[in-house]
């Protein structure tokens, strides 16, 4: 049975595996100033491979990748920020939107498109076309249904949308940030 689920409603839904979904965090700085924490729930019950890639990149537990760089979001930047659209990060190899690497090697295939881009806080994979997922991701700041079927949704911001909005304010139409926005720290939150 194929699930057609709304990502924004999944965060609060009580599904069978909801209690087993990993939660991860980013502690973000804008310029040199701490901006706050963003907490995200990963939908490993719908897209397990994609969710695991992101979770492991938050913890850094996989060590160094094929490109000789730590597989870890810590210290990486939000390199593309477009107000009323999304904030994009995850390029820890080149730091400009042209790099990145998954825990499975350079790129991996689109897992499925069951989850939809239904609103602010939706966490999705950035790519360069079909089956080119690496480490780059974006967080939507508005409803973006035109991305459905082209980008794999794998999570939802559960806390810290005010921080996402602060990041969004650093953006421009071209996507170039007004200030450097850095993932100062990141990891997994253990369930209690």
Swiss-Prot record:
Q: Which GO terms describe its molecular function?
A: cyclosporin A binding; peptidyl-prolyl cis-trans isomerase activity
Which EC class, in a word?
A: isomerase
Asked if the Swiss-Prot or TrEMBL record annotates the protein with the keyword Isomerase, the reply is: yes
Q: What is its EC number?
A: 5.2.1.8
Q: Which SUPFAM superfamilies match?
A: Cyclophilin-like (SSF50891)
Q: Which Gene3D superfamilies match?
A: Cyclophilin-like
Cellular component per GO, a single term: mitochondrion
What Gene Ontology terms for biological process does this UniProt record contain? protein folding
Q: Which UniProt keywords apply?
A: Isomerase, Rotamase
Q: Name one Pfam family in it.
A: Pro_isomerase
The PPIase cyclophilin-type domain extends over 25-188
Reaction(s) catalysed by this chain, per the record, are: [protein]-peptidylproline (omega=180) = [protein]-peptidylproline (omega=0)
Annotated signal sequence range: none
* Family recorded in the similarity comment: Belongs to the cyclophilin-type PPIase family.
Q: What does this protein do?
A: PPIases accelerate the folding of proteins. It catalyzes the cis-trans isomerization of proline imidic peptide bonds in oligopeptides.
Enumerate the PANTHER family for this protein: PEPTIDYL-PROLYL CIS-TRANS ISOMERASE, PEPTIDYL-PROLYL CIS-TRANS ISOMERASE D-RELATED
What's this protein's name? Peptidyl-prolyl cis-trans isomerase 1
Q: Give the source lineage, highest ranks first.
A: Eukaryota, Metazoa, Ecdysozoa, Nematoda, Chromadorea
